[in-house]
């Protein structure tokens, strides 16, 4: 049994090493994506104009008036003092061709007091420019910038499958790390003084053992992040009833016209606080996303600046029918079945935000360890492969010499 597990561990590890090395390093960085992005791009994120911010709806109107081919798809409903108002936008459809207009940006930062633009960018663009660096790393972490063809997002599927292989390999690795109970101490030790191959081996084995629990959590949540709908939700639904995913709800009826979308946006923002109170949500309305093509708007409930959710299970969201205002779906942290709460926990666990600052630090360390395990695993394989080839070469050389001697006689 053990020889078979060793072979499986070897080939699973080699097959996923490059992907996990990349995911580990990028994950260690993007655990701090908002802070690093703001540090690299102060003009995009900071605003110095004193005064009372304009209402979010007014800022959205000004942006869409300035860029008539763009529609705001997400906007904060309030901003922190000294910060810009940053909106996500998407291209409108050309009424003549029914094709989207070409836009070279999808994110815009405005001074919330004056409404003046402070910057724009294509979030997720494959670029190492300072303005694009952190979003680039984020996209690289989740999609590898692989293409989407025939409706299949190959990057998401690749990382999801890598996560499943990694999860299985994690259980194989822990079995191999403890061959017997008597030698358990060796599986936790690092032979630092010996260095060389001994230390490389211990970094791989013992490093994985010490953080095994965190590694399993990251592996499971990586599957959820990529293949939640295709794999995780069907599996979880076997054990627990799941409410429909609120972020995949589509309202009945045709796509909203621009006028209908604007009117619905204004109505839902006006009613958001009351709807939140009726649902027992204590946080204020903090953000609005709209999908005119699917006929829904969603309101997130959080304090200004906490759109990414700093702790716990994240923020509450209500998804409404844009035409009627009816609540079609909800995600309220801690509510629902055991399966619903499990699904709510996936991103907070994967990002470490479930435990606040300590959790994010732990995730950064785990990302570096994942990269280290990938490198040391390949180094161990190379050394053993060379060791296996050496006797074979010696035997071949001896056979060649013997053949020559027989030929000479």
State each model region's role.
Residues 1-409:
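Conserved histidines in hydrophobic membrane contexts and catalytic metal-binding motifs
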